[in-house]
Amino acid sequence: VGDDWQSIYRFSGSDMALFNQFPEYFGTTEINKIETTYRFGEPLVSLSSNFIQRNKAQIQKNIHSFSSEMRTELEFYAYDRRDYCNTIGQLVASIPSDKSIFLLGRYSFDDYYLSFMYQSIKEGNRFYYVIGGRKIEFLTVHKSKGLEANYVILLQCNKDTYGFPSQVSDDPVLNYVLTKSDQFPYGEERRLFYVAITRAKIKTLVLYDKRFPSVFVDEFLHPEKVSEESYVKHPNANKRWTRSADQFLLKLHNEG
């Protein structure tokens, strides 16, 4: 049992081909698709499904909600960098106090600006911000997989080296230990974005800098602006080989 739409751990050795090409590895196979979601409804069901299935390498599915009356919205908010924290505060204030909220970031440092304006609380491995008197958990999208909240606020969906999608390229030496990368532009990042926007039961709110919207944001709001050039990475977006990466390579080698 698995979901190739949510395969987001290539960096730790996950190989989507083992799932998508299962019959080639294990022979005669019967495939049964689970196409009912119990977390969210329309229009998010259709919007998220169309988004992830732009990559034809993903297994094609016809997802539907268990209830035709269930509604889950997907909204986008452009912010001015000077008013970024206030924008988040206003969004939080607009959400009923009895509803749960996640703040999600592509990177663990996507909450950087929040730390200047709002009180933070660390409880074990969990991290919160106090916004408008409410304690709201901040997580990376990777950590949020499998979790859910009534509302999700997705931070910093900008076109940047460390934006969403991330433009950072793996060092070529990692190809010796990691599985073959997705040939579809930003394939893994697309799956990660799908995971992010589908954590919500009521509404996902996507924040982006009005000057530098992510190509993923443009796919939803301005598809006419999207071209092949939109997916070209900046030539300087290369991950440097570091001592920690060297240790990671050695760990994978020792584990076989």
Could you say what each language-model-derived stretch is?
Residues 1-71, 166, 217:
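Conserved RecA-like helicase ATPase core segment
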Residues 3-5, 26-31, 70-73, 134-136, ...:
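Short glycine-/polar-rich loops that comprise or flank the Walker A/P-loop
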Residues 4-8, 14-16, 37-42, 108-110, ...:
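Conserved nucleotide-binding/hydrolysis micro-motifs of P-loop NTPases
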Residues 28-36, 57-106, 136:
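Inter-lobe coupling/hinge region of RecA-like P-loop helicase motors
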Residues 96-100, 135, 143-210, 219:
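Conserved helicase C-terminal RecA-like lobe
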Residues 109-128:
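Conserved helicase motor "Helicase C" RecA-like lobe of SF1/SF2 P-loop NTPases
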Residues 207-231:
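C-terminal/domain-terminus segments
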Residues 242-256:
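Short, amphipathic alpha-helical "recognition" segments used to contact nucleic acids or chromatin
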